[in-house]
């Protein structure tokens, strides 16, 4: 997410890379009277089932859920006036360099996919050429994830400052987006469909999350089309790679009803597109650390003055039903690329993990039962980013248990789950 990015270290992953498909060649001349060896035919490998063949939303959920984000790492931004950077800035927001241990730990904890947010602009020159060292570093991190058996989603993340969805900025933004995705896609063109690309992140007009105009919708959908066209043009496995395109501001309310039925871009291959939404509702409970009065949620609430009158279980069902109706029921898988709710640091609700974990489990369950892949936004609070040691077993349990178990009590307190 782009809201202040850290929020006391808790900002608001991904699905995996791949088998390199590198072919080894050997040769050698004969001589000295030795007979020429008969070449041994190379057997055709049996394709690994991937999203190239598993296309229904329910199959995608089985393959990829639950997911997690490697947040505040490759997306981290240092001072803007020193760009382009000549070395990695992935540690400037407090996390260690990404390593194999953390991805092994994600897999061991029960996560099946990881979203790897990456900011590219800060490593690109005036011709939009991304520094080779940065492409190599991102590739190394993607390989860590694949080595752990995870699906990976790789995106263009904190680049929204130049991806402005209006006609005044459209041409320049499209040109840069095309250049970036051409370079990224070429770097990974031999990776199989365990690696997914996601074109943009939370595109909206600067400093506003209000309802978009038709101009905003049209330009933002144009960014999706530019992304798809750029990736497909690179060929290789990118010709059929699964690609993730976003709703305006990643808000399910800004789907077909707001921005029109042509939400999905055209594509040269069928059934290889997913839609991405994000979910942090209700804001004052989930991520607004400045609000200390709203610290309970849903049917577990014991103090109705500490819970929002909206945004509880009923609202979750209502909004996720929109995603199911607009996309899942039409055969288009949906990625909830970010969602999260974090304990309060101060006030009467300090340490309110009972409620935040309940939110995590309920929203996971509500998502997967509607064909939506939930991916938790994590910035290092769940697992130790150096060693992979578990830091928050309660949250991990909530996210993994939510895959199959609805935590909602039979009876609710007040009207908390009837909104």
Q: What is each PLM-predicted segment?
A:
Residues 346-419:
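Aromatic-rich peripheral "rim/lid" segments of glycoside hydrolase catalytic domains that contact
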Residues 93-113, 124, 128-158, 162-199, ...:
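An active-site-proximal structural segment forming one wall of the substrate-binding cleft
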Residues 71-98, 126-130, 168-169, 284-315:
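Acidic/histidine-rich helix-loop elements
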Residues 25-35:
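Bacterial lipoprotein signal-peptidase II cleavage site
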Residues 1-13:
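Bacterial N-terminal signal peptides that target proteins for export
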Residues 175-312, 321-341, 369-372:
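Active-site region of glycoside hydrolase catalytic domains
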Residues 36-113, 326:
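N-terminal carbohydrate-binding accessory modules
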């Amino acid at each position: 997410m782009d809201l202040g990015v850290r929020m006391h270290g808790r900002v608001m992953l991904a699905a995996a890379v791949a088998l390199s498909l590198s072919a080894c060649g050997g040769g050698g001349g004969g001589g000295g009277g030795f007979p020429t060896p008969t070449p041994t035919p190379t057997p055709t490998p049996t394709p690994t089932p991937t999203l190239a063949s598993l296309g229904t939303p329910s199959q995608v959920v089985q393959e990829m859920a639950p997911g997690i984000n490697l947040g505040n790492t490759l997306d981290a931004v240092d001072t803007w006036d020193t760009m382009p950077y000549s070395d990695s800035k992935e540690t400037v927001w407090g996390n260690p360099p990404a390593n194999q241990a953390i991805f092994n730990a994600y897999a061991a904890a029960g996560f099946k996919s990881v979203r790897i947010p990456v900011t590219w602009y800060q490593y690109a020159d005036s011709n939009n050429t991304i520094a080779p060292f940065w492409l190599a570093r991102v590739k190394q991190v993607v390989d860590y994830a694949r080595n752990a058996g995870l699906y990976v989603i790789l995106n263009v993340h904190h680049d929204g400052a130049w991806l402005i969805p209006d006609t005044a900025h459209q041409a320049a933004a499209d040109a840069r987006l095309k250049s970036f995705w051409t370079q990224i896609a070429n770097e990974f063109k031999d990776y199989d469909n365990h690696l997914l690309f996601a074109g943009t992140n939370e595109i909206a007009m600067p400093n506003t999350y209000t309802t978009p105009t038709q101009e905003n919708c049209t330009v933002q959908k144009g960014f999706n089309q530019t992304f798809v066209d750029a990736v497909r043009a690179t060929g290789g496995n990118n010709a059929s790679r699964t690609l993730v395109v976003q709703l305006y501001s990643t808000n399910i309310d800004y789907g077909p009803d707001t921005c029109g039925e042509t939400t999905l871009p055209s594509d040269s291959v069928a059934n290889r597109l997913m839609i991405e939404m994000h979910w942090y509702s209700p804001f004052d409970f989930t991520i607004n650390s400045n609000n200390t009065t709203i610290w309970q949620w849903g049917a577990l609430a014991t103090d109705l003055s500490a819970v929002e009158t909206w945004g509880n279980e009923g609202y979750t069902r209502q909004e996720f039903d929109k995603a199911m109706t607009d996309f899942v029921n039409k055969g288009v898988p949906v990625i909830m690329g970010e969602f999260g709710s974090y304990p309060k640091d101060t006030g009467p609700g300090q340490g309110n993990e009972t409620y935040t974990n309940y939110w995590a489990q309920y929203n996971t369950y509500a998502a997967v039962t509607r064909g939506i892949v939930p991916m938790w936004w994590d910035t290092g609070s769940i697992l130790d980013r150096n060693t992979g040691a578990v830091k928050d077993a309660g949250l991990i349990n909530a996210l993994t248990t939510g895959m199959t178990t609805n935590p909602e009590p039979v009876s609710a307190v007040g009207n908390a789950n009837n909104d």
